[in-house]
């Protein structure tokens, strides 16, 4: 049994979120939550919420035991980019790209 939780449009770049996602892939849920709780990255807090949602989905919808769950799949895809302009000297302007991502976490029992 595999249960998923998704977050669309998280306001962090996919590249930064993947750094944290790679650390929890394949680990037991308790170990992954502990790792995310003590990480200082912004992506860790976002991924922790998505992982907790996936665990709650597994408990509520499938009646799964939390101790048996592990993080089977984590992937981060690029979301919509917001393009902004930063004024510079002498009438010039630079483009600022504010990136977002879509995060999917799947948990499964062994």
From Swiss-Prot:
Keywords: Ribonucleoprotein, Ribosomal protein, RNA-binding, rRNA-binding. Signal peptide: none annotated. Pfam families: Ribosomal_L22. The keyword Coiled coil does not apply. One of its GO terms (biological process) is translation. GO terms for cellular component: cytosolic large ribosomal subunit. InterPro entries: Ribosomal_uL22 (IPR001063), Ribosomal_uL22_bac/chlpt-type (IPR005727), Ribosomal_uL22_bac/org-type (IPR047867), Ribosomal_uL22_CS (IPR018260), Ribosomal_uL22_sf (IPR036394). One of its GO terms (molecular function) is structural constituent of ribosome. The keyword Cell membrane does not apply. Belongs to the universal ribosomal protein uL22 family. Part of the 50S ribosomal subunit. PANTHER family: CHLOROPLAST 50S RIBOSOMAL PROTEIN L22-RELATED, LARGE RIBOSOMAL SUBUNIT PROTEIN UL22M. This protein binds specifically to 23S rRNA; its binding is stimulated by other ribosomal proteins, e.g. L4, L17, and L20. It is important during the early stages of 50S assembly. It makes multiple contacts with different domains of the 23S rRNA in the assembled 50S subunit and ribosome. This is Large ribosomal subunit protein uL22. It comes from Pseudomonas syringae pv. tomato (strain ATCC BAA-871 / DC3000).
